Amino acid sequence: MAGCAARVPPGSEARLSLATFLLGASVLALPLLTRAGLQGRTGLALYVAGLNALLLLLYRPPRYQIAIRACFLGFVFGCGVLLSFSQSSWNHFGWYVCSLSLFHYSEYLVTAVNNPKSLSLDSFLLNHSLEYTVAALSSWIEFTLENIFWPELKQITWLSAAGLLMVIFGECLRKVAMFTAGSNFNHVVQSEKSDTHTLVTSGVYAWCRHPSYVGWFYWSIGTQVMLCNPICGVVYALTVWRFFRDRTEEEEISLIHFFGEEYLDYKKRVPTGLPFIKGVKVGL
C-alpha cells in the first residue's frame, strides 16, 4: 500500500486529500435534503452512493486510494458535527467522532506537507494496530452501554469539556512537534540514520524530548474523559503509559546510536515530558 502513494505526483497528495476530506464533510448539508422531503436514512444512503460514484468517476488508483480514505474521514467528521449539535445524549460522542477523524486525517496531511518522502497510505494511521482498534471499539461499547443504563453519566458537561480541552492540547502539541521536526519526523522508529537526519532540540523539543508522544498521550486519555468512560479512562491511561514507556526506550536506543554524546547530553538536560517515564537507562 505504501507504494501506491509513491506513484502520485509529488506535492499533490496534500491537495488531493484536503479536497476529498472537504467533499466528505459536505454531509453537513444533509439536513437540507431532509427538509426538501427526503427521509433521513434515504437521504444519507443516496448521499453516500453519490460520493462513491463521484470518487470512482474522478480518480483512478493510486489517487483513488488516497481520496476514498480522506473522503471517509471527512464524512465521519461531518457526521460528528451533526451529532454534536443534536438534541440527544449522544452529542458528546459527536465531539469524540470529530476529534478522532481530525486526528487521523491531520496525521496524513501534516506528513504530506512536512515529510512527503515518508508519506504512504499508512500515514492515515487507520490500520495502526489490532490493539488500537480493540481499544477504540471498547470505548464505543462502554459509551453505548452506559448511555443506555446510566445516561446521566454521559451528561456531565464540565467533564466532557475538560476532556475536549485535553484532546485539543494533545492534538496541537503533536502537530507542532511534527512541524518542528520536519523531515526528521517519521511514524516508524528508524533503525538506520539517513543522511538528512539531524537531532532537533529547538522549539517544543527544548521543553521535552518526545513532544509528539506527550501530545498523543494526553489526546488518548482526553478522548475517554470527553466520553465520561470511567473504565476505558483508567485502562487507556495505563495502556498508553506502558506503550510510550516502551516506545521511548526503543526510540532512544536508536537516537543514542545515531547521535552518541550529543543525544546523551540532550537527554540529561531535557525530560521526556511523559509522567514517570525517563527513557532508556544508560549504563555508566
UniProtKB/Swiss-Prot annotation:
**Pfam families the record matches:** ICMT
Catalyzed chemical reaction(s): [protein]-C-terminal S-[(2E,6E)-farnesyl]-L-cysteine + S-adenosyl-L-methionine = [protein]-C-terminal S-[(2E,6E)-farnesyl]-L-cysteine methyl ester + S-adenosyl-L-homocysteine
Listed GO biological process terms: bone mineralization; CAAX-box protein maturation; determination of adult lifespan; fibroblast proliferation; in utero embryonic development; liver development; methylation; multicellular organism growth
Lumenal side residue ranges read: 34-41, 88-92, 150-154, 229
Q: Which Gene Ontology molecular-function terms are recorded?
A: cAMP response element binding protein binding; protein C-terminal S-isoprenylcysteine carboxyl O-methyltransferase activity
Domain of life the protein comes from: Eukaryota
Q: What class of enzyme is it?
A: transferase
User: Recorded E.C. number(s)?
Assistant: 2.1.1.100
PROSITE patterns xref list: SAM_ICMT (PS51564)
Q: Which cell locations does it reside in?
A: Endoplasmic reticulum membrane
Write out the residues that bind substrate.
Answer: 247
Keyword line: Endoplasmic reticulum, Membrane, Methyltransferase, S-adenosyl-L-methionine, Transferase, Transmembrane, Transmembrane helix
Record's GO cellular component terms: cytoplasmic side of rough endoplasmic reticulum membrane; endoplasmic reticulum; large ribosomal subunit
Q: Which residues cross the membrane?
A: 17-33, 42-59, 70-87, 93-112, 132-149, 155-174, 213-228, 230-244
List each coiled-coil range: none
List the stretches on the Cytoplasmic face of the membrane. Answer: 1-16, 60-69, 113-131, 175-212, 245-284
Which residues of the sequence carry a binding annotation for S-adenosyl-L-methionine? 190, 197-200, 205, 210-213, 251
Q: How does it sit in the membrane?
A: Multi-pass membrane protein
General function of this protein: Catalyzes the post-translational methylation of isoprenylated C-terminal cysteine residues.
Which family does the similarity line name?
Answer: Belongs to the class VI-like SAM-binding methyltransferase superfamily. Isoprenylcysteine carboxyl methyltransferase family.
- Entry protein name: Protein-S-isoprenylcysteine O-methyltransferase
Q: Which organism is it from?
A: Rattus norvegicus (Rat)
